[in-house]
Amino acid sequence: MMIMFFLLCSIIFVVTIIIFRKQKRGKKRNTLPSPPGLPLIGNLHQLGRHPHRSLCSLSHRYGPLMLLHFGRVPVLVVSSAELARDVLKTHDRVFASRPRSKIFEKLLYDKHDVASAPYGEYWRQMKSVCVLHLFSNKMVRSFREVREEEISLMMEKIRKSISLPVNLSKILVSLTNDVICKVALGRKYGGETDFKELMERLNKLLGTFSVGSYVPWLAWIDWIRGLDCQLEKTANDVDKFFERVVQDHVDGNRDMTDFVDVLLAIQRDKTVGFEINRVSIKAIVMNVFVGGTDTSSTLMEWAMTELLRHPKCLKRLQEEVRTICKDKSSVSEEEIQNMSYLKAVIKEALRLHPPLPLMVPHESTQDVRLGDHHIPAGTQVLINAWAIGREAATWGPDVEEFRPERHLDSSVDYRGQAFELIPFGSGRRICPAISFAVVLNEVVLANLVHRFDWRLSVESTEDQTEVAESTGIAIHRMFPLYAIASNTT
């Protein structure tokens, strides 16, 4: 009996020494600042309701490069422009992949889309289809008539409610949905309640946290709270919808060429040198919806919020637009090119309110060094675009202030070359639809301030317009933006 006891104690002692030495070697090898976590869950409890804000606060204490653990998963958090450059440019290829995600795999056709597909040949092929065939400058210009028609309908809707409170948040979401529907699918689905409800479910679930993805032995929590059931139902409903859309295009003759038509033509004619199947078509089209509708409407919503909170900025923008357009009833896309203050307003809104404050996670595919730190393969990377937009070293002491003037004499742009402002990402994983999104945002905002004078409605209190944010993958206002339009004087 004593021998067995002694043997057991010896085994425990040896195992303890081995574990201790491994941990010690790991600490010597990786000296990254790391907030203390809890057993099993790591730092998950520190994310809070708004992770981009919580992680920004932690970075003020632990630095712009810190290592957290979400359950068993090591997560590197980047909160400065300089370090974002290292990840997205210097070591772009190493960090170009995406981590596994139960939610993305279930909702995005097992990651056959462009945004969540792991780095590799399939992703390169699908990215080239998007860049060359869907979001080329030629394609963006070809849908100008769609943008003009939908903006005209929006302006008429506002005109009919002149001097009455209008829900600008709802109007902007509707406009964006209608434009994306016509461009991607060939017709509008915005009036269909089932479609609206489905897209709301999809966007909400994409921003939902899955416990099981980070703490596998707690995966039962996802089942208990109904997440697994919601994912299954929504994935099936989404697939049925897009399958019906694709089949309608296969069966019918259409006058206008939309994204589905383009993808089907590529599949039929084999013009890209590789095969594109039905699943890939549906996944890419869904990417357009997820990446286009929520993010564009969010940016316009926040831009109008800030302009209404800062009447002097609104007045200066109106003066610029009205000076260039004079008595014209609408603003054209050519005239936008001469509106420097409008572009500054868009940049400032993107700085303070990036639609995706935490960029879609990256993952290292091999060991790499960032400065003096060793980053092992398989490390997830979260780039906090929201925190980078508030770096005092870059933007000055007034980082929390909405001041478009800061961009007028600045070369910083949002197209991925300046890492101080990366709302659309950078490097290999940069959003391929930047031009499409920006032209819509600019022309909508210009027309809103050209045609009408605006003031906040009593339904939108000062507190609501200031800081209240929703939760989800794209950060909207928590409360709808109500404003009152009046005819220009």
Swiss-Prot record:
<dbReference type="InterPro" id="IPR001128">
    <property type="entry name" value="Cyt_P450"/>
</dbReference>
<protein>
    <recommendedName>
        <fullName>Cytochrome P450 71A26</fullName>
        <ecNumber>1.14.-.-</ecNumber>
    </recommendedName>
</protein>
<dbReference type="InterPro" id="IPR017972">
    <property type="entry name" value="Cyt_P450_CS"/>
</dbReference>
<feature type="binding site" description="axial binding residue">
    <location>
        <position position="431"/>
    </location>
    <ligand>
        <name>heme</name>
    </ligand>
</feature>
<dbReference type="GO" id="GO:0004497">
    <property type="term" value="F:monooxygenase activity"/>
</dbReference>
<dbReference type="Pfam" id="PF00067">
    <property type="entry name" value="p450"/>
</dbReference>
<feature type="transmembrane region" description="Helical">
    <location>
        <begin position="1"/>
        <end position="21"/>
    </location>
</feature>
<keyword id="KW-0479">Metal-binding</keyword>
<keyword id="KW-1133">Transmembrane helix</keyword>
<keyword id="KW-0812">Transmembrane</keyword>
<dbReference type="GO" id="GO:0020037">
    <property type="term" value="F:heme binding"/>
</dbReference>
<keyword id="KW-0472">Membrane</keyword>
<keyword id="KW-0349">Heme</keyword>
<keyword id="KW-0560">Oxidoreductase</keyword>
<dbReference type="InterPro" id="IPR036396">
    <property type="entry name" value="Cyt_P450_sf"/>
</dbReference>
<comment type="similarity">
    <text>Belongs to the cytochrome P450 family.</text>
</comment>
<keyword id="KW-0503">Monooxygenase</keyword>
<dbReference type="GO" id="GO:0005506">
    <property type="term" value="F:iron ion binding"/>
</dbReference>
<dbReference type="InterPro" id="IPR002401">
    <property type="entry name" value="Cyt_P450_E_grp-I"/>
</dbReference>
<dbReference type="GO" id="GO:0016020">
    <property type="term" value="C:membrane"/>
</dbReference>
<dbReference type="GO" id="GO:0016705">
    <property type="term" value="F:oxidoreductase activity, acting on paired donors, with incorporation or reduction of molecular oxygen"/>
</dbReference>
<keyword id="KW-0408">Iron</keyword>
